[in-house]
A protein has these predicted regions:
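A short, structure-level motif marking secondary-structure boundaries and short turns
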Residues: 5-7, 20, 95-97
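A short alpha-helix capping/helix-coil boundary motif
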Residues: 1-2, 8, 89-92
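Conserved N-terminal/central alpha/beta ligand/cofactor-binding core
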Residues: 24, 30-31, 37-130, 134
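Beta1/beta-strand and adjacent pyrophosphate-binding region of the FAD-binding site
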Residues: 3-17, 33
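Intrinsic disorder/low-complexity segments enriched in polar/small residues
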Residues: 3-5, 29, 134-136
Length: 137
């Protein structure tokens, strides 16, 4: 038996952009679901071994705002991330960028915690295969 559920917003893809968007929308009072084909939120940033966000700051000041800033600050306060400013790029040592280095496992856990706290329905190992407009069956 299929259960019908209504959502104000369905976010397809639970990468960092999708997760941040879903959390922001849910905090504004929308009923939100995230459809994610993988097994966690955060996408490549949480599951690929990637441990840095480039362009995290400019001249020593963090650039992220909103949900992103909250997530990264919480990782830093917990000892699971740190800003590194003016890091030479591997492809051109003369170009320096600011980076946030973090623990991807902690990012996964934090995104899930924030989503659950916001009341988001998480649909892991699920893919969107069709969509329709309107309320017709």
């Amino acid at each position: 038996m299929q259960q019908e559920t209504q959502f104000d917003l369905i976010v397809v893809g639970g990468g960092t952009a999708g997760a941040f968007s879903a959390i922001a929308a849910a905090r504004e009072g929308l009923k939100v679901a995230v459809v994610e084909r993988g097994t966690c939120l955060g996408g490549l940033a949480a599951s690929s071994g990637l441990t840095e966000m480039n362009a995290a700051g400019f001249q020593g000041a963090p650039l992220y705002r909103g949900i992103e800033r909250e997530v990264f600050d919480r990782l830093i306060w917990g000892g699971h991330a740190a800003y590194h400013f003016a890091v030479p790029m591997s492809s051109n040592k003369e170009v320096k960028i600011d980076r946030l280095r973090y623990d991807p496992e902690r990012l996964k856990l934090l995104l899930e915690q924030l989503a659950v706290e916001a009341g988001i329905t998480l649909l892991y190992e699920t893919e969107l295969t069709a969509a329709r407009e309107g309320e017709e069956e």
